[in-house]
């Protein structure tokens, strides 16, 4: 009854991934982002990650893979998802939701740290403010975006963009693949 829908969904997902894979610059950007992360960890830096909705979950997943493990046992790496409910509710109430990530970056970000900002549209106001705060602190910025990169286009040290203009879930599906590859590459870089 739903097999055609299922096939169409999987076909579209494969098509979006294939289009992303066909652009060699995406592979170079993933490698550059992984090296940027590993360089920070080698200097005892940390990565702060943030996103909204499903991208928030991806930011948490990324941090968890760093502090925990991916495929193999190894030392934990300093990854913090900006996701503490008391912080989010305090800043939302006192300053507004656009500041939930930037206030955290201002509080704990340091020169040599990295911000990973995830936004499928590239237009999330709170991610844009977090990027601004990260730059002010001397941090490096990696952005996972979609569509045309939105307002985040050109603001990061490394932007990894999924140029899909349909629903956000297709962009998120590629983002999670990128996150897993970043972890794998960081592990290889740290083992050198």
UniProtKB/Swiss-Prot annotation:
Alphabetized UniProt keyword annotations: Carbohydrate metabolism, Cytoplasm, Isomerase, Metal-binding, Zinc
Role this protein plays: Catalyzes the isomerization of sedoheptulose 7-phosphate in D-glycero-D-manno-heptose 7-phosphate.
Coiled coil: none
Binding site for substrate: 52-54, 65, 93-94, 119-121, 124, 172
Pathway(s) per entry: Carbohydrate biosynthesis; D-glycero-D-manno-heptose 7-phosphate biosynthesis; D-glycero-alpha-D-manno-heptose 7-phosphate and D-glycero-beta-D-manno-heptose 7-phosphate from sedoheptulose 7-phosphate: step 1/1
Further information: The reaction produces a racemic mixture of D-glycero-alpha-D-manno-heptose 7-phosphate and D-glycero-beta-D-manno-heptose 7-phosphate.
GO cellular component: cytoplasm
Alphabetized Pfam families for the sequence: SIS_2
Protein name: Phosphoheptose isomerase
Molecular function GO terms recorded: carbohydrate derivative binding; D-sedoheptulose 7-phosphate isomerase activity; zinc ion binding
Location(s) in or outside the cell: Cytoplasm
Cofactor(s) listed: Zn(2+)
InterPro entries in alphabetical order: GmhA/DiaA, Phosphoheptose_Isoase, SIS_dom, SIS_dom_sf, SIS_GmhA/DiaA_subfam
Summary of subunit composition and partner proteins: Homotetramer.
Segments passing through the bilayer: none
Sites where the protein binds Zn(2+): 61, 65, 172, 180
Superkingdom assignment: Bacteria
Enzyme class: isomerase
Cofactor binding notes: Binds 1 zinc ion per subunit.
Substrates-to-products reaction catalysed: 2 D-sedoheptulose 7-phosphate = D-glycero-alpha-D-manno-heptose 7-phosphate + D-glycero-beta-D-manno-heptose 7-phosphate
Its EC number(s): 5.3.1.28
Family that this chain belongs to: Belongs to the SIS family. GmhA subfamily.
GO biological process, one term: carbohydrate metabolic process
Ranges of residues in domain SIS: 37-192
